[in-house]
Amino acid sequence: YNVDIYDKLPLPGGLMTFAIPQWRIPPERVVNGARELEEKFGVKIMLRTKIYAEEPVHEEGDDFAEKTISIEDLLKNYDALLIATGTWLSKIPRIPGAEAKEVTTALEYLYKWRIYEYGYTSKKPPIGKNIVVIGGGYSAVDAAEKALRTGAEVYLVYRRTIKEAPAGLYEIERIKREGVVFIELASPVEIITEDKTVKAIKFQKMTLGPPDETGRPKPIPIPGGEFTIEADLAIFATGESPTPPLKTTAAEKLGLKLNKDGSIAVNELMQTSIPKVFAAGDVVTGPSRIGPAIKSGLKAARSIHYWLSAKTGKLVSFSEVITQ
């Protein structure tokens, strides 16, 4: 098949290249892998190109896009499409003071450091003296570790206990040994500001109750259990949302079914409600790990192959090529 890849960023790889720290995934390996796809297999990678439906929605990384293409045009010009746009929309709780400029998300924090280190911007990300990261997943751990490497005193605060942290006991204990102060069973209730500048974060102590809809113990506020941590930078790592290239109204017009959380609905073959459109990765599942995302991409590739074969009546043999 002739394969074209569209990516809004200046380098291929998405979050692997522009957010996940180098000590987890060396970005040069990702870029070299993409180069190998071009040189050995003839894949065309169109960078700095954003795909949209109707009006483009601004998300992290869009500033690099020099060209936009509508998804309607792709549907006309290609035999099959695979959407793998991930989760680029971060969540910040609606609490007093959250609109302060020193409040950011783990994704934004890591992304801005990466584009600065790559030399794509001369604007250095903010370096705080006391940085508080809220969350218990890998994004929280990565942001805390990056903040620690800037020389800041770093607190990582999670509303459940270390046992329930999505990043796992090993990761939390590791960054504790490096110097991050981990505080469990606490949830932010207010960003304390002075002249619109962050000065501290007020937390509510929590206890664990019966399991919630996720199956994990539900955090329950302890009356009167409030405390504050001095901070000049607050980083929220409280979840990311799927970012398909089209929102609900545009999706309905095209006939593409989205789930309530904004993820793309697919069947067991990774096929969407539009037969020629497939989807894979976090835009389907929500935030996950690299392994499952890659696995779903491979599954989608096989499904596209068999679907095109059935459509044309020509079954082409399928073989996997392992690249170095």
Q: How should each PLM-predicted stretch be described?
A:
Residues A280-K314:
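A conserved FAD-binding loop/helix module that cradles the flavin
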Residues Y1, Y118-A152:
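Rossmann-like NAD(P)H-binding beta-loop-alpha module
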Residues R174-E178, S187-K199, T207-G209, K299, ...:
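Mid-to-C-terminal Rossmann-like scaffold of FAD/NAD(P)H-dependent oxidoreductases
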Residues E99-G128, P211-P287:
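FAD-site-proximal beta/loop scaffold in flavoenzymes
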Residues V57, I92-R94, I115, A143-A144, ...:
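Short glycine-/acidic-enriched loop or helix-start segments at secondary-structure transitions
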Residues Y1-K50, H58, K91-P96, D142-L185, ...:
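Beta1-alpha1 glycine-rich phosphate/pyrophosphate-binding loop at the start
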Residues V31-I95, E190-K202, T207-P210, A231-I235, ...:
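Feature captures the FAD/FMN-dependent oxidoreductase FAD-binding
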